[in-house]
């Protein structure tokens, strides 16, 4: 069934003004009244329709990633990885797949400035011949927590105070003082990378661990990385204040204007691979979303390029109604047992159904471009015209059959039901290595940002001491420097 065939036609193809039902409107300037100065009549259907439609223009904003901008383009394979995956869209160099990409800030509201210190979303929807593939990531390769059970509380802590609606450091530092796994993410967020110059000069990452499966059924863990061809650029504090003060939508404008001018942004896609049989060789768990995979041991392998060469036609239809879901994969790609990814698989689709309705995948921007067939019928805002008589399976009256079986990871799981943490936490090694890799001036800016955050008057001595301890375990001199700036002697 073609989801585009029965779309409502655009109102712009009429030479005159009409109501939603197509009736001609001869006056769109005045309400119907009794005489010149009398009361407005309820029978003025056009007025009622116009106001009722206006009252419902806004839909619930995303609980995270509310502020965003989208663009369209293509992904082209440049390197053969068929030994790793049987995914059709990766079948050979030169193959192109249409995409739509949404960039976003994470925590703040839909109209917030794009210069705030905040992670950035980097989500790509591939419209492949075997269905859509949503690679839903961020600009940082790690995350704050490794188990989705903590995600709602984490977002609550990062969001504004429910009493004052002000984002406050004491709430953030209090919550994450219970989660030393967050140190690695903070080594990115409080670094210079914390405020990208714009979306074009920003890296992307799939963040979670996925799996690639080849035709023989061999599976590998995989991490996805996007590298901008124009380089990475960021804004320091004074620059961010200046840019944000002049235009709170500067990154959206930069993306739109660049594409309109023919200066198409481009990213190279790289992957890192781990054989699941070798996962015990590392001092970290490959399914731990708070860890990066060392590139000197697990080098980046080139796959293809992403080019954005077309602006969206309508912001609401192709940005606000654009919906991603990490569970949407294609044959040859599979979700791993990464705890955060497993919870995202449920949460994203549940949020989209709340925000857009149960048939959100029928919206043109979310619908697959390839032929598709199932018995998912009816529900709120179902606008697919279907005339079949058989809406069950199997049936001798419907020739539709099962697709050809494709490989999935052949893993065998044993264990008892439990709520537990992973064995290899190793929370301090990677953030310490990252800090020591910076030049002294970059280290100094990082320290100043932490001093500023810990200077919040509602941050208690206990919370400060915990953070001094954490950063001392990552790098002994770092914890000491932060403590000395606050005139506090660290406990270790």
UniProtKB/Swiss-Prot annotation:
One of its GO terms (biological process) is hydrogen peroxide catabolic process. Its cofactor is heme. One of its GO terms (cellular component) is peroxisome. InterPro entries: Catalase, Catalase_AS, Catalase_clade1/3, Catalase_core, Catalase_haem_BS, Catalase_immune_responsive, Catalase_sf. It is found in: Peroxisome. It holds the Pfam family Catalase. Its main location: other. The keyword Lyase does not apply. Keywords: Heme, Hydrogen peroxide, Iron, Metal-binding, Oxidoreductase, Peroxidase, Peroxisome. GO terms for molecular function: catalase activity; heme binding; metal ion binding. Induction: By 3-aminotriazole. Coiled coil: none annotated. It catalyses: 2 H2O2 = O2 + 2 H2O. Heme binds at residue 348. The active site is at residues 65, 138. The keyword Cell cycle does not apply. Its EC number is 1.11.1.6. CDD domains: catalase_clade_1. Belongs to the catalase family. Homotetramer. Occurs in almost all aerobically respiring organisms and serves to protect cells from the toxic effects of hydrogen peroxide. This is Catalase isozyme 3. It comes from Nicotiana plumbaginifolia (Leadwort-leaved tobacco). The gene is CAT3.
